[in-house]
């Protein structure tokens, strides 16, 4: 969150708690069942038109829900175009032996189009390596 607080347009952030009545939820499908995902952070930024909300989901690469959550985030972004600034899955990625923090912004159509058809963590990892924004 330190990085998010540095830009001059930063306004506030919220730790989105799991399973609270007020929690923000993005649905995703896991094993054929609709499952709720509670993205970790919501960041508010000032804009000329008021406040823009960003959804940030730091996610380890060693969990079985990686690609289903990424697809769920991409579907959510497609269903809510323009409602959020960024809708990002973030993780540590190793490229050529160097680890870097990278993000896939599902609010970007080009990223979303690559993520929507995936069905494996290997495919998601390749997209992080090729298209992930270095943070």
Model regions and ranges:
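Electrostatic, structured charged patches in enzyme active sites and in nucleic-acid/phosphate-binding
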Residues: 1-135
């Amino acid at each position: 969150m330190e990085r998010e607080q540095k830009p001059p347009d930063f306004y506030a952030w919220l730790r989105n708690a799991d399973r609270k009545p007020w929690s923000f939820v993005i649905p995703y499908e896991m094993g054929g069942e609709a499952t709720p995902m509670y993205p970790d952070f919501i960041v508010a930024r000032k804009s000329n038109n008021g406040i823009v909300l960003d959804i940030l989901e730091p996610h380890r690469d060693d969990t079985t829900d990686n690609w289903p959550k990424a697809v769920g985030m991409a579907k959510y972004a497609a269903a809510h175009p323009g409602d959020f600034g960024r809708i990002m899955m973030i993780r540590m990625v190793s490229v050529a032996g160097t680890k870097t923090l990278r993000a896939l912004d599902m609010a970007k159509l080009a990223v979303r189009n690559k993520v929507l058809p995936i069905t494996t963590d290997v495919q998601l990892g390749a997209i992080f390596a090729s298209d992930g924004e270095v943070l």
